[in-house]
């Protein structure tokens, strides 16, 4: 019985590193290799929030030492951020961060792209983005849309 109580008292220390570091590290590696940017947003946002929590803890550790529930609160919050069924970091990104950060703000320089066009450009690698931007500057966005439609039409044939 004493063993179970000891585990319950240190549950945060046993589970915390796996939830707060190991799984996010693994998922971040997978996100880097995936073609979509949605998981990149999830994990970049997670690491930013986790860093802010760590800075907060380091700044006020003397106060937090007096709060016995702090490690459990932190664990629950990080579980909410990490677990795929909640995707809390993605929620924070889409509902709070995105309001203050313009999507594709570094895309297109002074060119007036629509939000949809910026999203398309943002999903590309830097080299591809530069090539498409040069093409758009020379021929206009309509020619890019025509090329995309032609490629989609060609894909349907096969």
UniProtKB/Swiss-Prot annotation:
<feature type="transmembrane region" description="Helical">
    <location>
        <begin position="41"/>
        <end position="61"/>
    </location>
</feature>
<feature type="transmembrane region" description="Helical">
    <location>
        <begin position="63"/>
        <end position="83"/>
    </location>
</feature>
<comment type="similarity">
    <text>Belongs to the DP1 family.</text>
</comment>
<feature type="transmembrane region" description="Helical">
    <location>
        <begin position="2"/>
        <end position="22"/>
    </location>
</feature>
<keyword id="KW-0472">Membrane</keyword>
<dbReference type="InterPro" id="IPR004345">
    <property type="entry name" value="TB2_DP1_HVA22"/>
</dbReference>
<keyword id="KW-1133">Transmembrane helix</keyword>
<dbReference type="Pfam" id="PF03134">
    <property type="entry name" value="TB2_DP1_HVA22"/>
</dbReference>
<keyword id="KW-0812">Transmembrane</keyword>
<dbReference type="GO" id="GO:0016020">
    <property type="term" value="C:membrane"/>
</dbReference>
<protein>
    <recommendedName>
        <fullName>HVA22-like protein f</fullName>
    </recommendedName>
</protein>
């Amino acid at each position: 019985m004493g063993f179970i109580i000891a585990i319950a008292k240190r549950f945060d220390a046993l589970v915390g590193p796996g939830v707060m570091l190991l799984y996010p590290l693994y998922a971040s590696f997978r996100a880097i290799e995936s073609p979509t940017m949605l998981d990149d947003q999830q994990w970049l946002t997670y690491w930013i929030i986790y860093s802010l929590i760590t800075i907060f803890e380091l700044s006020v550790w003397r106060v937090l030492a007096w709060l016995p529930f702090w490690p459990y609160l932190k664990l629950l919050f990080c579980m909410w951020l990490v677990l795929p069924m909640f995707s809390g970091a993605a929620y924070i990104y889409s509902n709070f961060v995105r309001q203050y950060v313009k999507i594709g703000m570094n895309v297109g320089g002074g060119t007036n792209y629509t939000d949809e066009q910026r999203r398309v450009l943002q999903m590309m690698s830097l080299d591809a983005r530069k090539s498409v931007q040069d093409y758009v500057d020379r021929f206009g966005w309509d020619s890019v849309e025509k090329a995309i439609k032609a490629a989609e039409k060609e894909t349907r044939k096969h």
